[in-house]
Amino acid sequence: MPKTRRGPRRSQRKRPPTPWPTSQGLDKVFFTDIQSTCLETVYKATGAPSLGDYVRPAYIVTPYWPPVQSIRSPRTPSMDALSAQLYSSLSLGSPPSPPREPLKPSRSLPHRPLIQPPTFHPPSSRPYANTPPSEMGAWSPPLGSSSQACPSPTPASGPKTCTPSGEAPSSACTSISFPPPSPGPSCPR
């Protein structure tokens, strides 16, 4: 069975150029500069003995940054003084020194907790019996209306229980809906 060629043979002309000097005009020498870390092409005259007499081009220079001018105010200590103070205060041999001036509590404001825990009232037949009307948060009927209003939502859950406006004022509408229902002779169902 004869072997078949799968592709054309590569031509010898597309080879990369050899890295060593050739005898034509100028020699191309590739080397890597340590500081610039990039591949450079150096042209040398034909017959140069070695790379020892190579002079680095003038455009490749190490960066030089001018010293930063001092912009701090006269009263600000320098970073050296700050670092020395920090090092002396954080040395391992001595314990940390207490603050120079302890914080004094202000006497004008009484000490109160920032967050008060929520109070839970268990559901009962009269949820607002011991609460003054200013803290009830219930909807008040407009002046001239004689109907019993439904208070705002209570922690109790369950079905709505509404009574007509003719019964005792101790009965209340227990509901979870918000905002309070519109005024009328009875609560909406």
Curated annotation (Swiss-Prot):
- Kindly list the positions at which Phosphothreonine occurs in this protein: T174
Biased composition regions of type Basic residues, renumbered to the chain:
1-16
Question: Region (Disordered): which ranges?
Answer: 1-26, 87-189
A biological process from GO: mRNA transport
- Stretch list, region Homomultimerization: 56-70, 123-131
Q: What does this protein do?
A: Rex escorts unspliced gag-pro-pol and singly spliced env mRNAs out of the nucleus of infected cells. These mRNAs carry a recognition sequence called Rex responsive element (RxRE or XRE) located at the 3' region of the long terminal repeat (LTR). This function is essential since most HTLV proteins are translated from unspliced or partially spliced pre-mRNAs that cannot exit the nucleus by the pathway used by fully processed cellular mRNAs. Rex itself is translated from a fully spliced mRNA that probably readily exits the nucleus.
Name of the protein: Protein Rex
Native source organism of the sequence: Human T-cell leukemia virus 1 (isolate Melanesia mel5 subtype C) (HTLV-1)
